[in-house]
Swiss-Prot record:
Gene name tied to this protein: Col8a2
Name of this chain's protein: Collagen alpha-2(VIII) chain
Biased composition (Low complexity): 162-188, 211-220, 261-271, 281-296, 359-376, 440-458, 472-482
Consequence of gene disruption: COL8A1(-)/COL8A2(-) mice exhibit decreased proliferation of mesangial cells, reduced phosphorylation of ERK1/2 and increased p27(KIP1) expression. Diabetic COL8A1(-)/COL8A2(-) mice reveal reduced mesangial expansion and cellularity and extracellular matrix expansion.
Compartment annotation: Secreted, Extracellular space, Extracellular matrix, Basement membrane
Region (Disordered): 66-542
Signal peptide region: 1-24
Summary of subunit composition and partner proteins: Homotrimers, or heterotrimers in association with alpha 2(VIII) type collagens. Four homotrimers can form a tetrahedron stabilized by central interacting C-terminal NC1 trimers.
Gene Ontology CC: basement membrane; collagen trimer; extracellular region
Domain of life, source organism: Eukaryota
Role: Macromolecular component of the subendothelium. Major component of the Descemet's membrane (basement membrane) of corneal endothelial cells. Also a component of the endothelia of blood vessels. Necessary for migration and proliferation of vascular smooth muscle cells and thus, has a potential role in the maintenance of vessel wall integrity and structure, in particular in atherogenesis.
Biased composition annotated in UniProt, kind: Gly residues: 429-438
Protein's organism: Mus musculus
Amino acid sequence: MQGALMPLPSLLLLLLGCGPRVSSGGGAGGAAGYAPVKYVQPMQKGPVGPPFREGKGQYLEMPLPMLPMDLKGEPGPPGKPGPRGPPGPPGFPGKPGTGKPGVHGQPGPAGPPGFSRMGKAGPPGLPGKVGPPGQPGLRGEPGIRGDQGLRGPPGPPGLPGPSGITVPGKPGAQGAPGPPGFRGEPGPQGEPGPRGDRGLKGDNGVGQPGLPGAPGQAGAPGPPGLPGPAGLGKPGLDGIPGAPGDKGDSGPPGVPGSRGEPGAVGPKGPPGVDGVGIPGAAGVPGPQGPVGAKGEPGLRGPPGLIGPVGYGMPGKPGPKGDRGPVGAPGLLGDRGEPGEDGKPGEQGPQGLGGPPGLPGSAGLPGRRGPPGSKGEVGPGGPPGVPGIRGDQGPNGLAGKPGLPGERGLPGAHGPPGPTGPKGEPGFTGRPGGPGVAGALGQKGDLGLPGQPGLRGPSGIPGLQGPAGPIGPQGLPGLKGEPGLPGPPGEGKVGEPGSAGPTGPPGVPGSPGLTGPPGPPGPPGPPGAPGALDETGIAGLHLPNGGVEGAVLGKGGKPQFGLGELSAHATPAFTAVLTSPFPASGMPVRFDRTLYNGHSGYNPATGIFTCPVGGVYYFAYHVHVKGTNVWVALYKNNVPATYTYDEYKKGYLDQASGGAVLQLRPNDQVWVQMPSDQANGLYSTEYIHSSFSGFLLCPT
């Protein structure tokens, strides 16, 4: 019985747990199979069980039908999760999130091609970066030669340097040509020196030829030469000068050349004369020096002279009293008359410094007392008040010239000076570089088609383009010029071969060219005076010493002889200038020689040195451009003739001059511009200024 009633609490607990379901759910209890009719019978009382451990209520002893139907029990413990239900309907779209962007997806398939339509031209792009230098292009045609640029203004002449001390030094190495010096005054003509002995014949040197030697003994006359070939005709007349060419366009600027190596340092110049400097201003007084060491006591001086007798009677000297206390400084009394010079007393101990008294009025100078013994050096006093600046003393005597001081540091920039006078208008400057590209403006109206502009400058070489297609087979080119000889091979020297058979005699060759002229021989002895010919005129000398002249021949026409000097032995030259605007104040160096017999003209210096004494004719022809020109023909640093030409703007003018001069051996003749204010001598590679000279007759 007791065992059958044990599950009753469990049934009550189950009923209480299902009560809320029935009241709230409706058909939940019926579905579980718990009918209320089963528990209508009276419930028997059993033993009191233990309180509920899991719930919050306690067992009630009352019949089941007495329970109210609307009573709700305590919520039971949460049950186990049930099975997953079916998915619900989709909810409303939520608010856009702010998450991180997802991984970039794969590219989608290509869309259909768009419609073709002509788009508007976009604005010009900004200039790209400068690309690397491209390969050198094909050689272009030579451009038209431009006009010569304007001549720059001449620089101001420098100050003359001080004359150096003349000391006979050792001859130095050949230095670079120095700057042209100032034109000196012509010196007096020296007396002719004594005639020297004939020296031995030396090798052909580079220096100036020496004086001619004494005439040697007359040699035997040589056999007469073969007659020369007949001439080809008389020389034609000079052609008409061509018309001046049009002004060419200025060529593009050339590529700047590489920087040359620095030249060798020139020899050190002689020391200059000592300069006379202006004595400097008095320096600032230096600080007070330290106290010197105590000197040795000097010798006791002799006693002074006995002074005159005083007016009062001298009293007896009393005993020396004790030193009293230092009293207050008294008022400055009137200056008394100078007393008698007493004997120098013994040096007493150094007293304490009293307070400074009021400055008294300057007294009359007293008599000079005997020199006392040297006292000890006292302590340094306080620095005195700086005195009033004294009047400026008289100028001192000029001091000895001092040595040049070291170069000082550059001074600070001074204040800007006053505005100077307005300068002359300068030359037209070069066109400036391209400016910064401005902002893109609004599109303007369509303008009228302009005229074709001038050809612009060559652009920067672009990048190398892609290789083009292979072209058709080209025509065979012309035969090229023979190349330069290659370097010698490295093969071994072969053994000498056997001698071949003697070939047939060759065809006689054509006569060779005339060889270079040989060195001139020594001058021969003077010939005997020739016979006077009444029918001849003044002509050339014959080898036998006579004068052939121009004998009246057939038809009364003169017949000239061959003469004494041949073309290769006659001193003559012609030199041209290939660069414009040479320096003034020095010989003009006509740097290219067309003919230079006897090598008398030196193109490196522009000076002709006379190799054979005689009468010479000199001529010069110059072009003028940029400014006026003033040219002179110099003989031994003395001007012989002057030529001046006034320049007209826009024209290329010419000037010429000449003179007949008698020269002795080693005399020098050259062309020079005396002033740098008229130095417009112009010459180029194709417009030559020239200088010529030749021997008319020897003396």
